[in-house]
Amino acid sequence: DKPLGKVRIFGGSPELLYKSDETFGGCNTMFEISDHDIGPDREKMSAFINLRILTYDLNKDGKKEIIIVKNLSASGRLMRSVKLFTSSEVYNLEWDGLGLYENWKTRKIDGYVADYQVYDIDNDGQQEIVMAIVMATGGMLQGRSVVVYFKFNQPQPAAPEGGR
């Protein structure tokens, strides 16, 4: 029921090949199982709905990269029971046979990413990251959400040797 987790890589078997040092994910969306569903003698349970992890070949090298969100909490890891994410980063990670390395990440985004997808939103033939971002949540601030997209700055293929 933790909203943040480490990325784990398995090699087609139960054997763990890799576990990230950093935590990723994070979501303020959860559901509770009521006393009625579990009986009066049991403790209420809750579970967070984790964000998806996407895989795409964005750099067109024939290998899929991992596109993953890290929602950041203002309370950090000090208060585990408080899950209030206020900013985010999106990472592009790639497996090199030994571990995951970072190809790129976005700048820090104000608000937390509630969902995201890779899609050609402007019909220019290039994929973008489209994100649903929650800018403010409840409390004294009225909830506000936006949909934004980031263009990839992919390197262009080199010109052939010997001119054009």
Predicted features along the sequence, with ranges:
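Beta-propeller-forming repeat regions
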Residues: 1-164
